[in-house]
A protein has these predicted regions:
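Extreme N-terminal tail/first-helix region
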Residues: 1-18
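Charged, gly/pro-rich active-site loop segments
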Residues: 2-3, 76-132
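Hydrophobic alpha-helical segments typical of transmembrane helices
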Residues: 4-8, 54, 95
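Short beta-strand segments
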Residues: 17-50, 64-68, 79
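A short beta-turn/loop motif at secondary-structure boundaries
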Residues: 27-29, 70-74, 113-115
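Short secondary-structure boundary segments
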Residues: 49, 70-71, 125-126
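Short, surface-exposed beta-strand-loop junctions and turns on beta-sheet-rich folds
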Residues: 52-54, 73
Length: 132
């Protein structure tokens, strides 16, 4: 797993690649959403607002999969499969601001809605594979 994480380090750390996050609905059907992400200390982190479908699907222990396609070469990608390790409101506003810096070049997340509660979701990889 560490070898794949190293091989695709540019996608996990440097590029402004969106991740496609797959979660499971209560009936077992897949739900797929493009998301911003970061990867730190072997943990993939995404951010969402409380009440959204993907947030409801990502309780601790829930299985998830993420595909990250290289924006410079669509035939190259990394896939992370794992489980939700942690969901936290604390630190989620800071995290979404960090992601806004990465993806938009802005210090503050500009799309916050009044009363919105952010959630940071940490995904513990069980496998990391890729192509290209």
């Amino acid at each position: 797993m560490a070898e794949a994480a190293e091989k695709y380090s540019d996608l996990l750390h440097l590029k402004k690649a969106f991740a496609t996050l797959a979660t499971l609905m209560p009936d077992g059907s897949p739900q797929v959403t493009p998301v911003w992400f970061d990867y730190q200390n072997g943990v993939l982190r995404v951010n969402t607002a409380k009440g959204r479908t993907k947030a409801r699907n990502m309780a601790p222990g829930a299985p998830v999969a993420v595909a990250i396609v290289d924006p410079d070469n669509p035939y190259r990608y990394v896939q992370v499969r794992g489980r939700v390790a942690r969901v936290a409101e604390q630190g989620a506003d800071v995290h979404i601001d960090q992601l806004a810096k990465k993806y938009l070049g802005q210090d503050k997340y500009p799309y916050a809605q009044p009363g919105e509660v952010r959630m940071m979701v940490e995904i513990e990889p069980k496998s990391i594979t890729g192509m290209g």
